[in-house]
Amino acid sequence: MGTKKGNLSIDSENIFPIIKKWVYSDHDIFIRELVSNGCDAITKYKKLDMMGECELPDDYKGKIQVIVNPEEKTLKFIDNGIGMTAEEVEEYITQIAFSGATQFLEKYKDKTTEDEMIGHFGLGFYSAFMVADEVQIDTLSYKEGAAAVHWVSEGGTEYEMQEGNRTEVGTEITLYLNEDSLAFANEYRAREVLEKYCSFMPVEIFLSKANAEPEYETIDEADVLDTDEVVEHITEEPKEGEEGEPKQKAKIVKRPVSLSDIHPLWTKNPSDCTKDDYIEFYRKVFMDYKEPLFWIHLNMDYPFNLKGILYFPKINTEYDSIEGKIKLYNNQVFIADNIKEVIPEFLMVLKGVIDCPDLPLNVSRSALQNDGFVTKVADYISKKVADKLNGMFKTDRENYEKYWDDISPFIKFGCLKDEKFGEKVKDSMLFKNLDHKYLTLEDCIKANGGETAEETKAEETTDSEETKETPKTNIFYVTNEQQQSQYINMFKEQGQDAVILAHNIDSAFITYLEQKHDNVKFQRIDADVHESLKAEVAEEEKETFQKNADSLTEIFRKVLNNEKLDVKVEKLKDENIASMAVLSEESRRMEEMMKMYGMGGMDTGMFGGQASLILNADHPLVQYVVENKEGENVELICKQLYDLALLAHKPLSPQEMTAFVQRSNQIMRSEERRVGKECRSR
């Protein structure tokens, strides 16, 4: 064939600057696109062989070679796939590939950065011009009698094609890198990108550096393969003083190691995978050497093809930020991390891989949001996670409880974000009580003397004509076992129980549960003084008790300079407690909501959010205040009792803590003087 020259299109002059702009953050995708093309060529070659349209050599093994050459500033991609004739180069490169790039541009031109294309797929061969000033193709088709073809283009606007000199079936693409992209001729940078996108492609991928000095290894002679390049045969004599026959060794050129695991774990049958396989794969992909708690192996062929593995990592419940990483693949080619349009938002705390060949990729993120197929994929993934959790709850309760503290934030978040998921797992929710035993919601209701949903429903059926309000069962909870230990001890002494809700998500979650279950009300242990903690006031003492209560209210309001302070006087069964602070559940929820929305600096008092002071009428210090209203130590004692009550309720502000410490020192010095005076009087 003679030399053929041509122009692609006048519009092409505008394509590449715009493409570079839009895929700037993923500037390295050209490697994925070119390797994917080579992978497709090998796959087609194998299919033609299976169909009897060609015959592969007996020792055929599909492979892709990537060769960096920093001296010549080039990057080569070589595959032994199907190859192309001159007509096919004309069709696929000059027409179809260019058309694909044009369509890519059309999709992109009206997109904002918030509505980017998923994975930038569809750019294909022309992604090479993002990094190269010149691109050359040398190819030879598998077809009998086909001539080799050499194609070259500078800048992607004009091309020249003539007969080439390639002798092996396949394609070689050479990129002459521009000055801004020379880093891709570095072996380490190329390896980084290949491992990012191509670690699990179904074809072996080898990376090498042009003109590099060969590396060698020594192996047993019996292990030499036909493909090995033997440099030297070595006879190793036994060491002095040792018996045995001489060992025959061979020095060979070091065997290349593929960067691609062509049979990743998610493509295998779950029954063929061991625990060690799953853990090893997790560590390899996520570079996390802590073991995951457990995992779910997804394997679906109908109505769509989806495979993958989702891992439940150990979550640190002390922090707000819970971030996982789910990698999305298409036929073992990496697309992107954490595509929230495909993967339900609450699953983003997990780690895993999902491979869905049927997923539309050459569309924008906004288009995916309204795609019915994508919705089905997300629903399926959510259902499989719920099924796994329910299965563990029913058949492996011991381990489920062991994992609960780590997985509960994820499950609660899932309930808040996905109503279907919440409905599926509602019976598998657990609550840890003060004895660190795990209860279901129904267990909690029964433990607090309430009726379960089934019992309530049965009563309503029996007396359907009478309309009555559903009785609510209070479920008490604590958020900080150390800070609220005073209340916990009082509860335990009276045989009361509470559940531990220590994670930041729990405030929203209990509101969600109250909306779902109208027979349940959650109340923090210090929201009020439970009746079981109070002693009854004798009838003959009630008048005096009320007078003392009024007097104490007046004294504390005056000393604390707070006329709005709510003071309640109770006879507590625990005589060791002088004062307590309580904040109604409604006020606390309002306070937490304000903090969540960045309104923490506002005065919560305007919403009735001030803590009430509870004084124990039977405590000596409280009695001292009543009996010595004008005493010199009354002000000191009142302020100290108030701060002690707050300390068991919440942390003091820096100013409050400073004043509290100063008063504590004053009390100790006063006690020291008193003891010293007594000693001297003896």
Regions from the PLM with identified roles:
Residues M1-A185, E192, S199, E217, ...:
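GHKL (Bergerat-fold) ATPase N-terminal catalytic module, capturing the glycine-rich phosphate-binding loop
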Residues E71, V675-G676:
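Generic N-terminal leader/processing signal
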